[in-house]
Amino acid sequence: MQFIDYVKIYVKAGDGGRGCISFRREKYVPKGGPDGGDGGKGGDVIIQASSELHTLLDHRYQKVYKAQRGQHGKGSNMKGKDGENLIIKVPVGTVVKDAETEEVLADLDEEEKYFIVAKGGRGGFGNAHFATPTNQAPRYAQPGEKGQERWVILELKLLADVGLIGLPNAGKSTLISVISSAKPKIADYPFTTLIPVLGVVKYENYQSFVVADIPGLIEGAHKGAGLGHQFLRHVERTSLLLHLVDVSDFSESDPREDFEKIQKELELYNPALTKKPFAVVGTKIDIAYKGDRLGKLKKYCEEKGIDFFPISAVKKEGIDKLLHYLSEKVGKKCGLL
């Protein structure tokens, strides 16, 4: 299934039904008064969160959503039937924005949470509504009001406790496949992960938590380079970030610079991301034979007071210690421990 996390749609609420112009015409009521009924209200367009959905794929192909209009009023004071509301289901974690101003209209971060994105028009009054002592036979009724319409942006931000970030091929996919039941594509080339992957982690007697594997970031990601900022939004909701840095002998870059590049991209995208609790994970220690890169990164983290965990996901070295740390941190953050 394709992962779509950003779409633009048009919504139109139902118009109100028009009021009716009618008069009583009964055999023994020669001067029957007005009896035109009111028009029905137009249906609202409602966007509602559902845990059954995990992507905005459906809305990529259907861009226009219109609610039912209200029916017109009838004689004998019969009110027109209200139009049915149109409910648009989206994944939990979807943010609704005005397409023109980009103002956040709603953050649907809970199951069944909803937002009325376009309100239906009021039905028009029938002529019975306008009868007065001086005008007992009004030949006027109101038209229904127009329903609201607008373009909106639906933006999905995944709900995860821990976000795995790092340069391409840092070992994020391997780690999440070891600590959870998630099975992302794994290979020894950059950008293997093209979409965010979620995995549920259960460690000993701790509460389970959700980890998100975010596609690899590169310099300029905040401007859209590489897979770009389209996936940076998914780390905004996390409680804790894990910076994964390749410390193997096969990587030629300075591990300290690798870490700082990602920190810079986070700050340029959203400075609040650098304020989140985080730890650094040195990956692939099973092929860090010389230990130079591992030593540099470990010393750097010690000097900066950063929690550091050297691991080998392939050989499961250091994994237990890392999971214990994550379980305690996420548990405390969620108030579970």
UniProtKB/Swiss-Prot annotation:
It holds the Pfam family MMR_HSR1. PANTHER family: DEVELOPMENTALLY REGULATED GTP-BINDING PROTEIN-RELATED, MITOCHONDRIAL RIBOSOME-ASSOCIATED GTPASE 2. Coiled coil: none annotated. CDD domains: Obg. This is GTPase Obg. It is an enzyme of class 3 (hydrolase). It is found in: Cytoplasm. One of its GO terms (cellular component) is cytoplasm. An essential GTPase which binds GTP, GDP and possibly (p)ppGpp with moderate affinity, with high nucleotide exchange rates and a fairly low GTP hydrolysis rate. Plays a role in control of the cell cycle, stress response, ribosome biogenesis and in those bacteria that undergo differentiation, in morphogenesis control. Keywords: Cytoplasm, GTP-binding, Hydrolase, Magnesium, Metal-binding, Nucleotide-binding. Monomer. GTP binds at residues 166-173, 191-195, 213-216, 283-286, 312-314. Belongs to the TRAFAC class OBG-HflX-like GTPase superfamily. OBG GTPase family. Mg(2+) binds at S173, T193. Residues 1-159 form the Obg domain. SUPFAM superfamilies: Obg GTP-binding protein N-terminal domain (SSF82051), P-loop containing nucleoside triphosphate hydrolases (SSF52540). Its EC number is 3.6.5.-. The gene is obg. GO terms for biological process: ribosome biogenesis. It comes from Thermodesulfovibrio yellowstonii (strain ATCC 51303 / DSM 11347 / YP87).
